[in-house]
UniProtKB/Swiss-Prot annotation:
Upper taxonomic lineage: Bacteria, Pseudomonadati, Pseudomonadota, Gammaproteobacteria, Alteromonadales
tRNA-binding keyword on record: no
HAMAP family: UreF (MF_01385)
GO cellular component, one term: cytoplasm
Keywords in alphabetical order: Chaperone, Cytoplasm, Nickel insertion
Location of this chain's protein in the cell: Cytoplasm
Gene this protein is translated from: ureF
Protein name: Urease accessory protein UreF
Lineage: superkingdom: Bacteria
Complex formation: UreD, UreF and UreG form a complex that acts as a GTP-hydrolysis-dependent molecular chaperone, activating the urease apoprotein by helping to assemble the nickel containing metallocenter of UreC. The UreE protein probably delivers the nickel.
Family to which this protein belongs: Belongs to the UreF family.
Function: Required for maturation of urease via the functional incorporation of the urease nickel metallocenter.
Pfam family, any one: UreF
An example molecular function term from Gene Ontology annotations: nickel cation binding
């Protein structure tokens, strides 16, 4: 009996591509950035597992849900439609919403690192030969969206992968700098898994005029991190 396996193989390849894109082993240097979390430890805002869970939930609700996640969906749709104007608009919008020099630097450097990796994998020419122009100074989310679209990863799965990668990175920071035990990190994952799904549902439902992060505490912590005397991370 002949069985058509092409759709299954295609979805499997997309899933594997997503797993590769969010892997901690991806050589783009994401491990070097804490997104302000190290400063929260230094300032005494986060000192235990419960406070860390509250911090991460706050960043998820007031940050990613209203900034990176909905814009990632828009950027991936722009890549699908070869909408160069939309790509430039949302890429610039993300840059404008990085409230400190370190957060802006993180986004830009990770985007450049991912572009270098794509070049090493001989994928960058596919961007240059496409119908949409790559925005000037593409940030990490913009390049992530292109690779997700190129690998035919559904938008919702792209968002799931992105938020999972964010959480893993934040918990890795906490395990190094807090320090947080690995079992405690797994408890926090269990606590935040359903909240990440809710965040994606919310992000996909937001209109353009509802977007924008509301994280004054993170911005203040990130700004103070620039002059923090002793630190492990670049943000």
């Amino acid at each position: 009996m002949h069985t058509n396996t092409e759709p299954t193989q295609s979805s499997d390849l997309a899933l594997l591509g997503l797993m590769q894109l969010i892997s901690p082993a991806l050589p783009i240097g994401a491990f070097a950035w804490s997104q302000g979390l190290e400063s929260a430890f230094e300032l005494g805002w986060v000192t235990n597992e419960q406070q860390l869970g509250e911090w991460l939930e706050g960043v998820l609700d007031d940050g990613l849900t209203r900034c990176e996640l909905p814009v990632l969906a828009r950027l991936q749709n722009c890549w699908a439609k070869s909408d160069s104007e939309g790509l430039s608009y949302w890429n610039d919008w993300l840059h404008a919403n990085r409230e400190t020099a370190e957060l802006s630097d993180e986004d830009t450097r990770l985007g450049l690192a991912l572009m270098r990796l794509l070049n090493s994998l001989q994928l960058q020419p596919q961007i240059e030969q496409g119908h949409a122009a790559l925005p000037q100074d593409p940030g990490y989310v913009t390049v992530f969206a292109w690779l997700a679209q190129q690998r035919q990863i559904p938008v919702r799965q792209s968002l799931l992968g992105f938020v999972w990668g964010w959480l893993e990175n934040q918990l890795a920071v906490a395990c190094k700098a807090m320090p947080l035990g690995h079992t405690a990190a797994q408890r926090l994952i269990e606590q935040l898994r359903p909240k990440m799904v809710i965040a994606i549902d919310t992000a996909l439902a937001l209109a353009d005029d509802q977007l924008g992060p509301i994280m004054p505490g993170l911005a203040l912590g990130s700004a103070q991190h620039e002059t923090q005397y002793s630190r492990l991370f670049r943000s």
